[in-house]
Amino acid sequence: MGIDINHKYDRKVRRTEPKSQDVYLRLLVKLYRFLQRRTNKKFNRIILKRLFMSKINRPPLSLQRIARFFKAANQPESTIVVVGTVTDDARLLVVPKLTVCALHVTQTARERILKAGGEVLTFDQLALRSPTGKNTLLLQGRRTARTACKHFGKAPGVPHSHTRPYVRSKGRKFERARGRRSSCGYKK
């Protein structure tokens, strides 16, 4: 008598295609599937995987951070690749000459990059220019930077917790007494 094997946990949970029905995104997936198969390079595998990702996992990257990473990398000829959005940062006064490839670049960021003598590429242009990912700098934004992530972690109020509490309102009466002032219990 055979053993009845439980196949309950057999499914591997990972995206094999993007959820979006955007035809342009799906064309890029088709292109990078081909490149990943034919070149067998890690760069193309990472790009393909990131094209599948949800918007939460493709956080935006500001020009300020791009400029900082670019300077630290010390590779003036490299192309910066971001599978996501590149946004402008008004606090950055001087934009260096950059070659940026991204899914989306905001209008002001694009203007500033072009004004500095740089260029903005699409992923199909990058595939022609650098099919193996040679001379590129692959960057991504901070996934934990969004406001929702500030609520995750140790419970608010416990020692050494910097977690933001879920509060109905930010008024005088809400989470402003015990632990916040010495007249009510203690001051943290």
Swiss-Prot record:
Main location: cytoplasm
Pfam families: Ribosomal_L18 (PF17135)
GO cellular component, one term: cytosolic large ribosomal subunit
GO biological process, any: cytoplasmic translation
UniProt-listed InterPro entries: Ribosomal_eL18, Ribosomal_eL18/eL18-A/B/_CS, Ribosomal_uL15/eL18, Ribosomal_uL15/eL18_sf
Gene Ontology molecular function: any one: structural constituent of ribosome
Keywords: Cytoplasm, Ribonucleoprotein, Ribosomal protein
Localisation: Cytoplasm
PANTHER family per record: 60S RIBOSOMAL PROTEIN L18, LARGE RIBOSOMAL SUBUNIT PROTEIN EL18
Homology family: Belongs to the eukaryotic ribosomal protein eL18 family.
Protein's recorded name: Large ribosomal subunit protein eL18
Species assigned in the record: Drosophila melanogaster
Gene: RpL18
